[in-house]
């Protein structure tokens, strides 16, 4: 019997689970006899059945259901104590969890460990002598690609001496992970202006480092838009889908984004009374605004997105890759600069040509909504979508094929 593939998605966001799920499905399609084990650290109630239906065995690494979207994660002090010891190390370089992962690997004896930006699992695999594949939307730790001034503008108190000392150390760690990986796959197109000083960028010319494009689930075909709308109780007018994302650094930023969406949409309804908005966000309370429908979480939102005039979303990278595979016009919004983990992504999307906004006023967001419902966003987004998905479609099959080669 062949050794299993272990999938180890980062527990911090549903996007890592979703990308690992897409790869799991494709790996199972390539070889239904290949055993796949998923070490699942978050949203077990949603993703355990999804991974099981994809042909994988699921092991929860936690004693209960974990959901990082329902609380904030940072203080406004950027120093060794609060940021490194209080957040970065326990979240991304956790010694206790490293021991747990090594124990799992010893029990499972995998042919390869596929880490979806789970850097703790990556380090454990490398130290344990297991073949390792890193799937990443990041070219380095987020802290490395942001300046102290970026954090100050977001309201952080920055200890420059301590943080400046941390950055090069983090890049060395990320570089070590890359150099000790059999394969590195990324779905983020490189931009020299943003990436030149990162750990991954100098390695992009190496044979085992690949920008592949969107690693997403299959895109739906022949969607019955009328049926999708009926199931959600929607009419036939212009439809906006607005998402407030998953993991947040500060809950007030998520709440501020929701209020801005609502105010901008209320303004839009004055000229487009048949317009509707589906507001999606884990833990989002119901609202009774005219034309607004709230949903907590939609495991498969692709059919809904194909019905929309545009998506309004935070720049979580799995969202970015899914809209690229679908060709959906998208407005990317950051509710607050304190969401530092998404600031680099927003800058990249802006450079590629997408409409973007940081802490927009309701008037500014309304103007973009108006462009969406009148069809004026299509040309603006077309070139940017091509940069994200050069082949014009998802790259999951190609990525799974590369992983399968490592197994062989």
What are these regions (language model features)?
Residues 8-9, 19, 187-191, 212-272, ...:
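Active-site donor-nucleotide binding/catalytic segment of nucleotide-sugar enzymes
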Residues 373-408:
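C-terminal amphipathic helix plus adjacent low-complexity
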Residues 29-30, 34-92:
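Conserved nucleotide-sugar phosphate-binding/catalytic loop shared by glycosyltransferases and other
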Residues 16-28:
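Short amphipathic alpha-helix
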Residues 74-114, 119-120, 160-165:
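Conserved nucleotide-sugar donor-binding subdomain of glycosyltransferases
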Residues 112-116, 299-344:
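A donor-sugar binding/catalytic signature common to diverse glycosyltransferases
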Residues 131-217:
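Active-site-proximal region of nucleotide-activated glycan assembly enzymes
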Residues 99-100, 278-284, 289-319:
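Donor nucleotide-activated moiety binding/catalytic core segment of transferases
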């Amino acid at each position: 019997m062949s050794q299993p593939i272990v999938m180890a998605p980062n527990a911090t966001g549903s996007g890592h689970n979703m990308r690992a799920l897409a790869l799991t499905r494709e790996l199972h399609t390539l070889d239904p006899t290949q055993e796949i084990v998923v070490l699942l650290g978050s949203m077990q109630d949603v993703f355990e059945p999804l991974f099981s239906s994809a042909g994988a065995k699921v092991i929860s690494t936690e004693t209960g259901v974990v959901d990082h979207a329902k609380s904030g994660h940072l203080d406004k002090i950027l120093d060794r104590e609060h940021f490194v010891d209080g957040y970065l190390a326990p979240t991304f370089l956790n010694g206790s969890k490293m021991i747990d992962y090594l124990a799992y690997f010893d029990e499972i004896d995998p042919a390869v460990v596929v880490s979806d930006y789970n850097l703790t699992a990556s380090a454990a695999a490398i130290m344990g002598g297991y073949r390792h594949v890193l799937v990443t939307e990041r070219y380095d730790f987020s802290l490395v690609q942001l300046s102290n001034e970026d954090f100050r503008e977001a309201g952080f108190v920055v200890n420059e001496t301590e943080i400046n000392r941390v950055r090069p150390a983090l890049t060395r760690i990320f570089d070590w992970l890359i150099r000790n990986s059999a394969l590195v796959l990324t779905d983020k197109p490189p931009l020299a202006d943003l990436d030149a000083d990162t750990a991954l960028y100098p390695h992009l010319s190496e044979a085992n480092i690949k920008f592949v494009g969107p690693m997403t689930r299959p895109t739906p075909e022949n969607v019955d838009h009328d049926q999708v709308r009926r199931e959600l109780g929607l009419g036939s007018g212009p439809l906006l889908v607005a998402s407030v994302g998953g993991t947040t650094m500060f809950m007030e930023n998520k709440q501020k984004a929701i209020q801005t969406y609502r105010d901008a949409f209320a303004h839009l309804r004055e000229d487009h009374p048949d317009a509707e908005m589906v507001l999606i966000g884990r833990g989002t309370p119901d609202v009774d605004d005219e034309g607004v429908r709230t949903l907590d979480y939609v495991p498969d939102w692709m059919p809904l997105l194909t019905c929309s005039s545009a998506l309004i979303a935070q720049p979580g990278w799995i969202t970015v890759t899914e809209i690229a595979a679908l060709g959906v016009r998208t407005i990317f919004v950051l509710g607050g600069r304190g969401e530092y983990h998404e600031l680099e992504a927003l800058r990249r999307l802006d450079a590629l040509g997408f409409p973007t906004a940081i802490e927009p006023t309701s008037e500014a967001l309304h103007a973009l909504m108006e462009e969406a419902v009148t069809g004026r966003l299509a040309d603006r987004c077309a070139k940017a979508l091509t940069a994200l998905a050069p082949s014009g479609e998802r790259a999951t099959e190609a990525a799974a094929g590369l992983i399968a080669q490592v197994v062989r």
